[in-house]
């Protein structure tokens, strides 16, 4: 550009000098014009190159700006999505807060109705009934064991009395045979026979008394065992009925708990829970009635158990009495042996 300006400035100064040349040399003017046209072509190319460079720079700048704009658009869309998600979360949080408020209101209403306290009382009463039933079963097992031991003791006593009676009978027969053999002895032998007869009469009386006592004991024990078995069967039936009622109560309680847990935070379901609680009231009243009916039954069972204990003590006393009688029989047997020894000694002396 500086060269072009210098050439433009030098152009008019050299024009008057060139006019005589033009006039003198007419053939040299086209060469000068051609040389001036080559000077003008260089700035045009420079301008075109500069315009191309600027266009390329602008294109590159526009391309970078478009990339940045695309990135900004993506970020804007991501922000839109995040704002939508944030709005959805806010709506969910608002719904959860509303449900929480409703649930708190429902819990306050339920606390006002005191259903949970009634359910806890029901559970405690059911546990008490379970403990009562377990105690009754344990007492029944104890009674059965005592009955078996009684029957075993009675059989042992019967066997011992029969064996003792057989031994006494054999000994009496042996004594009678010995007395018959020694019938020709002196008055001492007669006195001995009289004493032996008296002893035999005493033994017969003792045997009769023992047989009577054993028969009375057996009859009374049989009657008592029959009554005990009847009472035990009745108690087992009552216990089974109580167990059935307990299972029914458990099933009802499980159903009610399932219903109570399935309640949600709507007014209609709250009303259903209220009606359910109103339905539970007569059932609780019926349960209280059943428990009030069970209490006299349990008292009767305790009285019967006390009677059984007294009967067992009486039987132990009777067994002790029988053992004393058996000891007396052993003493009588020892006396009979002594008499036999004396009779044998007298026969040896004779």
UniProtKB/Swiss-Prot annotation:
**Keywords, ordered alphabetically:** Coiled coil, Endoplasmic reticulum, Glycoprotein, Membrane, Transmembrane, Transmembrane helix
Q: Which GO terms describe its cellular component?
A: endoplasmic reticulum; endoplasmic reticulum membrane; membrane; nucleolus
Organ and tissue specificity: Expressed in vein endothelial cells. Isoform 4 is expressed in lung, kidney, spleen, thymus and skeletal muscle.
Where along the chain is composition biased (Basic residues)? 1-11
> Which coarse location class applies to the principal site listed for this UniProt protein?
endoplasmic reticulum
This entry's comment on induction and repression of expression is: By X-ray irradiation.
Q: Where is this region: Disordered?
A: 1-39
The protein's PTM annotation reads: N-glycosylated.
Keyword Transmembrane helix recorded: yes
Enumerate the transmembrane spans: 46-62
Entry's InterPro entries?
Inh_kappa-B_kinase-int
What more the UniProt record tells us is:
Shares a common promoter with APAF1 from which the 2 genes are transcribed in opposite directions.
**Protein name, per record:** Inhibitor of nuclear factor kappa-B kinase-interacting protein
Gene name as annotated: IKBIP
